[in-house]
């Protein structure tokens, strides 16, 4: 997408069925509420990443992706990179493929805008 600000963007998020892990995602949603035009909770991380890559979403974030999520996330990562998007951990570091990660994907234009809320 060409959206250059969190304001007016479309953002998706994922969360675990484990309440202690999910609370972090819900806290971020509460912080950014009112800035994006829409905040969606749709499906698996791999689908969210592909929707960022094709421009349906401007960004997606999910805390605490587990090791068993890595195959889906790594496939989605290739799609993001091919679309010139941006994929990192919430702290800005590269995703580590053999451990749990807090993942953020963006169109590359709103990374800094979103990352300030992912603490």
Which residues does each predicted region cover?
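An extended, acidic
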Residues: 2-119
